[in-house]
Amino acid sequence: MAIRVYKPTTAGRRNASVSDFSELTRSTPEKSLVRKKSKTGGRNSYGRITSRHRGGGHKRQYRLIDFKRWDKDGVPAKVAEIEYDPNRSARIALLHFADGEKRYIIAPKGIKQGDVIETGAQADIKPGNNLPLKNIPTGTVVHAIELRPLGGAKIARSAGAAVQLVAKDGAYAQLRMPSGEIRNVDARCRATVGEVGNEDHANIQLGKAGRARWIGRRPITRGESMNPVDHPHGGRTRGGKPPVSPWGKGEVRTRRPKKASNKMIVRRRPSGKNRK
C-alpha cells in the first residue's frame, strides 16, 4: 500500500492524503458473502444515544469475514481477490477453497493474488496460514488471535496490527500485544501468521470535516461551549470545577477491577511516564 498526498489546491485538500488502493484487484464484493447493514446513529433500541459522535455516512454492506477457519483444516485455498472493506481499516482477501467454498479473511501483509493458504496444525509458517499457537515457533509475529479455543479471532484485526509470540509455558502461550502488554492465552487458540496489511492506514490525513462525515463521524463539541442545561461546563461562569462528563461524572476507569481475565495478564501495558 502507498499513500497519495494531494496538492493544496483548496483548503480541504491541504495536507489531505488517501490510499492509492494499488493492492486491490476487485471493486465489487462477492455477492454470496454480503449482508445488509442498518445504521443506528449511535442509538440503542430505546432511541437514546449510547455512543456519541456517530451518525450519517455512506451506505455500507457488511462482508462476512471468517474469523474461525478451524472447519477448513487440511483444505488448501487460493487467494482469488484482494478487496476493500468499508467496515474495517484492513483489506480483505477472497479465498477459493479446494472444496469449492468461498470465504473472506483479513488480508495479511505481503499476501497477493494467486497465493495458496493453508489451515491446520501441519500448515507451514508463512503469512496467511492459520494454526494453533502451540504449533507456532516462539518469536513469530501473528494476528487474528483467539482468546478462547474455537471462539473466533478477537485480537489484532485492524490495519497494521501485529502480536509477537514471546514464550510458551505448558498449556499457555505468552503474547506481546501492540500496547506492550504481555498476557497468557490458551496454547490451543488459533492465530494467523504475519501481520495485518494496509499498515499505512494510520498515516492517512482526512484533511477536512466532510471526509469524517462520509465515514459516519459527527463533530465533537466542547462542554464549555454548551449551555448549562446541556453540560456541567456550560455557561459563561468559568473555573472552580474539575473536568466531568456530560452527566457530571469525573474520570473513571473503564476496565472492571475484578475482571476474570486479569489473572492472564503477565505484565500490564506501559502507562504514563513509562509509555514509549
Swiss-Prot record:
Protein name (database record): Large ribosomal subunit protein uL2
Provide the taxonomic classification.
Bacteria, Bacillati, Actinomycetota, Actinomycetes, Bifidobacteriales
- What assembly does the database describe for this protein? Part of the 50S ribosomal subunit. Forms a bridge to the 30S subunit in the 70S ribosome.
Q: Which GO terms describe its biological process?
A: cytoplasmic translation
The residue ranges flagged as biased composition, category Basic residues, are: 255-276
Could you tell me which Pfam families the record lists for this protein? Ribosomal_L2, Ribosomal_L2_C
- Family membership, please give it: Belongs to the universal ribosomal protein uL2 family.
What are the start and end residues of every segment in region (Disordered)? 14-58, 219-276
Q: Which residues form the signal peptide?
A: none
GO cellular component terms attached to this protein's record: large ribosomal subunit
What UniProt keywords are attached to this protein's entry? Ribonucleoprotein, Ribosomal protein, RNA-binding, rRNA-binding
Outline what the protein does.
Answer: One of the primary rRNA binding proteins. Required for association of the 30S and 50S subunits to form the 70S ribosome, for tRNA binding and peptide bond formation. It has been suggested to have peptidyltransferase activity; this is somewhat controversial. Makes several contacts with the 16S rRNA in the 70S ribosome.
A GO molecular function assigned to this protein is: transferase activity
Q: Which domain of life is it from?
A: Bacteria
What InterPro entries has UniProt attached to this entry? NA-bd_OB-fold, Rib_uL2_dom2, Ribosomal_uL2, Ribosomal_uL2_bac/org-type, Ribosomal_uL2_C, Ribosomal_uL2_dom3, Ribosomal_uL2_RNA-bd_dom, Translation_prot_SH3-like_sf
Record PANTHER family: LARGE RIBOSOMAL SUBUNIT PROTEIN UL2M, RIBOSOMAL PROTEIN L2
Does this entry carry the keyword Ribosomal protein? yes
- For bias type Polar residues, the affected ranges are 16-27
